[in-house]
Amino acid sequence: MPLVKRNIDPRHLCHTALPRGIKNELECVTNISLANIIRQLSSLSKYAEDIFGELFNEAHSFSFRVNSLQERVDRLSVSVTQLDPKEEELSLQDITMRKAFRSSTIQDQQLFDRKTLPIPLQETYDVCEQPPPLNVLTPYRDDGKEGLKFYTNPSYFFDLWKEKMLQDTEDKRKEKRKQKQKNLDRPHEPEKVPRAPHDRRREWQKLAQGPELAEDDADLLHKHIEVANGPASHFETRPQTYVDHMDGSYSLSALPFSQMSELLSRAEERVLVRPHEPPPPPPMHAAGDARPTPTCVSSAAGLIENRPQSPAAGRTPVFVSPTPPPPPPPLPSALSTSSLRASMTSTPPPPVPPPPPPPAPALQAPAVPPPPAPLQIAPGVLHPAPPPIAPPLVQPSPPVARAAPVCETVPVHPLPQGEVQGLPPPPPPPPLPPPGIRPSSPVTVAALAHPPSGLHPTPSPAPGPHAPLMPPSPPSQVLPASEPKRHPSTLPVISDARSVLLEAIRKGIQLRKVEEQREQEAKHERIENDVATILSRRIAVEYSDSEDDSEFDEVDWLE
């Protein structure tokens, strides 16, 4: 419905009702018509004055804008004409310190406001009937809303439009985030290699020489793989086996020097396991104890020196494990093949007689067994048998942490009695771990190549070659002299000042988060009825969405 800005009254000059009792009606109508014409002329002159006043105001504002634009052009022309090319145009400091350009012009918005209401419309508005005085009830409302807005609300349509615009902008942002999350969650598909076209020319070429000379497709494929990846090594194609009987020609003492060195070189690359058995589980450590799996070797030089180099030295009987022991870990990097081979060149001592078989389990439970000693095995033994476990006399303490897999230990040169007595006492054993960790294997574990920082290996004098194998004693049966000592903590004590400082830092971080949240809320509250801000934000979101959609379309097209 159009709004009538100016209404000229009276519209009908002669359409009037004549009063009763008038004798000369023609004269009365003429006078009334002339009066209405005069009223129309006065109304027209008044509106003409309003129109010319508005034109004058518009011309004045236009002149002001033109003058301000002319001043800006003059300043720019002076700066352009008087620019010295020898001087530095713009320093880096000016670029970083200068703020971004922001226009000072105010965009025209909220055109239909009470302040911009024309005078004729204001007069028409004043003629209208007044609404009921509901504003008197506004101070008594708890929700803070104006009472008159329930009867008439001029800003209702603008608020409805503003809510719709902001909701559309937020929906577009949510859709954009959802699309990005979907692209991140989507797994990276491998590049699809196009299938080569089927060509029967190669088959006909193979059959042209005769079916006898035609090569098998599997052989061709194997050749292509060898050409692409290189020939496979011998130890990779050879199946891994487990030797159950090491007597006779399988004994290490009966091997020649060349075969023995070959076996030692392969020991770093291959681990023998019994077939049809799964590999042992990895060692379990305490939570947070991330350390590499320790590799262990006990007196590897003694293993090589105790082996005779000539096969004529005789065959040594070998004790073989009746139960499948876990495989040993690979040799450490510090023990190279060259050092092993160099140690083989030394003069070997006379062969050591084999140890006696392990005693019966009933005889291996002494009243107070000695501390665990390294397991001693004769040359040629690959996997020792785990000795039986002595029954605990008292309630066992928390189980010891599970150590690395069982390693092959070999005898070392026994020390003279004087040297054994002159050695310092061994340090105390490592402290027990918290309960819940799996107990260690009954077989004595060799020295660790990379022990953790919290544990200290306990070196003990090696017994003679004829010493019987003794089972390790449970943790509860260890002598009182070897109880773990309580070392004082080396961690620095946090003083009250440091705790106060940490608390202040935490509070500062929390305050910073609260301030950032308030700034975001203030930005949202700053919108209010700014039409230009709402429209610019909507345009920016739509523009970014259009760019993202084009990128997604390109990705889908490439796929």
Swiss-Prot record:
Entry domain remark: Binds the Arp2/3 complex through the C-terminal region and actin through verprolin homology (VPH) domain.
Assigned protein family: Belongs to the SCAR/WAVE family.
Keyword NAD among record annotations: no
SMART domains found in the cross-reference section: WH2
Organism: Rattus norvegicus
Function: Downstream effector molecule involved in the transmission of signals from tyrosine kinase receptors and small GTPases to the actin cytoskeleton. Promotes formation of actin filaments. Part of the WAVE complex that regulates lamellipodia formation. The WAVE complex regulates actin filament reorganization via its interaction with the Arp2/3 complex. As component of the WAVE1 complex, required for BDNF-NTRK2 endocytic trafficking and signaling from early endosomes. Also involved in the regulation of mitochondrial dynamics.
Modified-residue entries (Asymmetric dimethylarginine), positions: 341
InterPro entries noted in UniProt: SCAR/WAVE_fam, WH2_dom
Gene Ontology BP terms: actin cytoskeleton organization; cellular response to brain-derived neurotrophic factor stimulus; dendrite extension; dendritic transport of mitochondrion; lamellipodium morphogenesis; mitochondrion organization; modification of postsynaptic actin cytoskeleton; neuron projection development
Annotated localization: Cytoplasm, Cytoskeleton; Synapse; Cell junction, Focal adhesion
Superkingdom of origin: Eukaryota
Residue positions, PTM Omega-N-methylarginine: 341
Basic and acidic residues bias spans: 182-202
Residue segments, region Disordered: 169-202, 307-400, 412-492
UniProt name for this protein: Actin-binding protein WASF1
Keywords annotated in UniProt: Actin-binding, Cell junction, Cytoplasm, Cytoskeleton, Methylation, Phosphoprotein, Synapse
One example GO MF annotation: actin binding
Subunit architecture: Component of the WAVE1 complex composed of ABI2, CYFIP1 or CYFIP2, BRK1, NCKAP1 and WASF1/WAVE1. Within the complex, a heterodimer containing NCKAP1 and CYFIP1 interacts with a heterotrimer formed by WAVE1, ABI2 and BRK1. CYFIP2 binds to activated RAC1 which causes the complex to dissociate, releasing activated WASF1. The complex can also be activated by NCK1. Binds actin and the Arp2/3 complex. Interacts with BAIAP2. Interacts with SHANK3; the interaction mediates the association of SHANK3 with the WAVE1 complex. Interacts with ABI1 (via N-terminus).
Biased composition (Pro residues): 322-332, 347-374, 384-399, 423-437, 458-477
A GO cellular-component term linked to this record: focal adhesion
Residues recorded as bearing Phosphoserine in the entry: 489
